[in-house]
């Protein structure tokens, strides 16, 4: 892709991100690549049929309009599924950077022009492709991911028959913070010996496998293969759809846990927020160790950048990024590890293709589209409940209980009001998160506090103080 095409594609992606919002963009468009532009048509690709179908059904007009804003002559956008290439073993040396991946510090296992993945096959069930670069050795540990890394390492080092400490282990975070890296590292480490069977599956792969088994009347073999696994690793659980598929996942989850087998799951939100999943599944997932990977701090971002430069030198020995440039990138590219990966890739390409050393001026020009304005903090209902309980000297369980004493009712109403005004949750969902209350109860609380804050200056000050604490 020429520099002109790359710049054009970056602008189109920027328009698309602004149009649909960051969450939608990260979920559905982050792995979409530009293949070519010919006259009046654009050829894009995605790694899975599921993504292709969803984008074509829900966003085809949006994608076309974003391209037409850049190139008015475009009248057709073709979307295809790119095929992964398979390899045999994980890389033993420090990995070289490749094209950036959705959700992780490392690049996609399914990019045709990047890392070459490998599949793990166990009996009747084939696992999702594994990227040989995604190992514990290449994972950069920092304050925001220490607990997740330690828990994943504990799982990976377990032996068949050992007591299972964290089951299921549930890791959640925003896009590009290292979930898939850790899950694949668990799989590689677990399969390094011959003692245990460790299987890595994306939620999409699980869905397609189960549906295919139903169609071919091999569902029994599918179930037996899954339940014969010692460690089942499921990625991107938020994409698990369909009541029948969810029921089978729930049965598999219960069967493995009850048999003392390990389950590791990753998603982009905590179990309680997976509203599309059955309550039984959410409850079972929440019963294990739930670990959040927080946004990358500046020190961790700097560490990731340094590791990518070292990785690049395994193939390009003369490549170097001066410390001031690394510090600039760590300070200004704050969104996720994928953007940091992309920044190093761009500097490497520019330096090698133009035979120029990396400078601060070059970096400022090459990564300008990766520097995004600060986004407002995502506030969770659990945070609201915790801070309100602390403010009013009650417990979180009091807020969720049926108690109707004055010292509990008012804090509960304030918490519901803040949940409605500071989150995108619906009234029924807020009610469910406050002890299974009806949406009318939430609506009454919201209206009650709205009326009081306009007349009661003390309450108004308390609410504003709570908002500041939540937004810090």
From Swiss-Prot:
Gene: dnaA
Gene Ontology BP term (one): regulation of DNA replication
Chain intervals for the UniProt region annotation (Domain II): 73-128
Biased composition (Polar residues): 110-119
Domain remark in the UniProt entry: Domain I is involved in oligomerization and binding regulators, domain II is flexibile and of varying length in different bacteria, domain III forms the AAA+ region, while domain IV binds dsDNA.
Keywords noted in UniProt: ATP-binding, Cytoplasm, DNA replication, DNA-binding, Lipid-binding, Nucleotide-binding
Name used for this protein in its record: Chromosomal replication initiator protein DnaA
Record region (Domain I, interacts with DnaA modulators): 1-73
Subunit: Oligomerizes as a right-handed, spiral filament on DNA at oriC.
Pfam families (alphabetical): Bac_DnaA, Bac_DnaA_C, DnaA_N
Gene Ontology CC: cytoplasm; plasma membrane
Superkingdom assignment: Bacteria
Protein purpose: Plays an essential role in the initiation and regulation of chromosomal replication. ATP-DnaA binds to the origin of replication (oriC) to initiate formation of the DNA replication initiation complex once per cell cycle. Binds the DnaA box (a 9 base pair repeat at the origin) and separates the double-stranded (ds)DNA. Forms a right-handed helical filament on oriC DNA; dsDNA binds to the exterior of the filament while single-stranded (ss)DNA is stabiized in the filament's interior.
Subcellular location(s) of the protein: Cytoplasm
Residue ranges with Basic and acidic residues bias: 99-109
UniProt-annotated binding residues for ATP: 176, 178-180
């Amino acid at each position: 892709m020429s520099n002109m095409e790359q710049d054009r594609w970056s602008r189109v992606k920027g328009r698309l991100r602004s149009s649909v919002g960051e969450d939608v963009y990260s979920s559905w468009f982050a792995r979409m690549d530009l293949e070519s532009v010919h006259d009046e048509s654009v050829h894009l690709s995605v790694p899975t049929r599921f993504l292709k179908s969803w984008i074509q059904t829900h966003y085809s007009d949006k994608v076309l309009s974003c391209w037409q804003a850049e190139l008015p002559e475009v009248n057709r956008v073709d979307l295809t599924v790119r095929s992964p290439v398979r390899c045999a073993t994980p890389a033993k040396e420090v990995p070289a950077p490749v094209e950036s991946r959705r959700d992780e510090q490392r690049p996609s296992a399914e990019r045709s022009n990047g890392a070459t993945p490998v599949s793990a096959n166990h009996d009747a069930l084939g696992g999702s492709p594994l990227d040989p670069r995604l190992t514990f050795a290449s994972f950069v540990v920092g304050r925001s991911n220490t607990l997740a890394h330690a828990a994943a390492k504990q799982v990976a080092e377990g032996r068949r028959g050992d007591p299972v400490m964290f089951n299921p282990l549930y890791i959640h975070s925003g896009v590009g913070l290292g979930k898939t890296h850790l899950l694949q590292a668990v799989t590689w480490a677990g399969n390094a010996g011959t003692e245990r069977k460790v299987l890595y599956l994306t939620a999409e792969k699980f869905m397609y496998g189960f549906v295919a088994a139903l169609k071919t009347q091999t569902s029994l073999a599918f179930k037996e293969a899954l339940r014969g696994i010692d460690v089942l690793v499921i990625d991107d659980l938020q994409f698990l759809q369909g009541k029948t598929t969810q029921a089978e996942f729930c049965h598999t989850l219960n069967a493995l846990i009850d048999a003392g087998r390990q389950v590791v799951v990753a998603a982009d939100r905590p179990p309680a927020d997976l509203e599309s999943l059955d309550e039984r599944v959410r409850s079972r997932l929440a019963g294990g160790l739930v670990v959040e990977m927080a946004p990358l701090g500046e020190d961790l971002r700097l560490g990731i950048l340094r590791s990518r430069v070292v990785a690049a030198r395994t193939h390009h020995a003369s490549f170097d990024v001066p410390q001031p440039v690394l510090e600039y990138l760590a300070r200004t590219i704050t969104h996720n590890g994928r953007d940091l990966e992309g920044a190093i890739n761009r500097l490497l390409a520019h330096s090698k293709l133009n035979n120029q050393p990396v400078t601060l001026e070059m970096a400022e020009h090459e990564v300008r589209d990766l520097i995004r304005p600060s986004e407002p903090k995502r506030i969770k209902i659990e945070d609201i409940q915790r801070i309100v309980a602390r403010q009013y000297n009650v417990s979180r369980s009091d807020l969720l209980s049926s108690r109707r004493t004055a010292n509990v009712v008012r804090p509960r109403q304030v918490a519901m009001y803040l949940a409605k005004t500071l989150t995108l949750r619906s009234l029924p969902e807020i009610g469910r998160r406050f002890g299974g209350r009806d949406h009318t109860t939430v609506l009454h609380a919201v209206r009650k506090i709205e009326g009081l804050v306009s007349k009661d200056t003390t309450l108004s000050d308390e609410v504003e103080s709570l908002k500041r604490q939540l937004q810090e």
